[in-house]
Amino acid sequence: MISHLLPTTSLTIHMPSIILYPIYFDKSRPRRFRCVPKDKAILNPLAKNIADVVRDLGYKCKLEPLKTHPADWVNPGRVEMVLPEKIQKKYVINEIAKVLLLRPTVKTDPLSLPIQNVPARLPENPPAYPKGVLGNTILPLHSPALSGGGISENMFQEMMQEMQKQPGLAGGMNPMAALAGMGGPAPPMPTPQASSSQRKQKSIEPEYDLDLE
């Protein structure tokens, strides 16, 4: 059943607020991405489900289905929640996590968030990830891993470049390390091709970049 969330265009939040991304509650992610312990996290969290829980707990919020955490590019969506006075962010997140544990994500949940110009039906194929990357198996219908046959190499490269600009990656962490936190090894970094003249020279340890060929 589709809940009546406040549309993103009709709610302007002037009070103190917090941003909630699905990755904060994702059991498959390393601790540096989660905001709750692993035993309080779930598999395949969705922003729409988080928004439903926030509303059911009595808080005001707006769902932003197109906003994406830099380390969770396949799972678009986030929730902006009004944080009442004298309520701490940690307390709210733990309360949300408790309810999410009682409402594990199911395959049909993405249908509860219709997206314009996206067919309201479950995908026939599983999410498509770049080689060597594992990820969530239940995603919003507008996930780039479900549309157009999956993530193209060009799109993947653009995402990597965008992640490098994001301050949300602790300590300037390499975005490849962020992808490694998706439950599988990061895609192998390409080795630059040496010219014939370079092959004759003494081998030198190559520098790696993010250009995926």
UniProtKB/Swiss-Prot annotation:
Gene inactivation effect: Leads to sensitivity to camptothecin, thiabendazole, microtubule depolymerizing drugs and DNA damaging agents.
Region feature Disordered, mapped onto this chain: 176-213
Any single GO BP term: intracellular protein transport
Compartment(s) of residence: Cytoplasm; Nucleus
InterPro entries documented for this protein: Signal_recog_particle_SRP19, SRP19-like_sf
A Gene Ontology term for the protein's cellular component: cytosol
Gene Ontology terms for molecular function: 7S RNA binding
Pfam family, one: SRP19
Keyword Cytoplasm: yes
Keywords in alphabetical order: Cytoplasm, Nucleus, Ribonucleoprotein, RNA-binding, Signal recognition particle
Family: Belongs to the SRP19 family.
UniProt subunit comment: Fungal signal recognition particle consists of a 7S RNA molecule (scR1) and at least six protein subunits: srp72, srp68, srp54, sec65, srp21 and srp14.
Protein's job: Signal-recognition-particle assembly has a crucial role in targeting secretory proteins to the rough endoplasmic reticulum membrane. It must be involved intimately in the translocation of a wide variety of protein substrates.
Name of the protein in question: Signal recognition particle sec65 subunit
Species the sequence originates in: Schizosaccharomyces pombe (strain 972 / ATCC 24843)
Gene: sec65
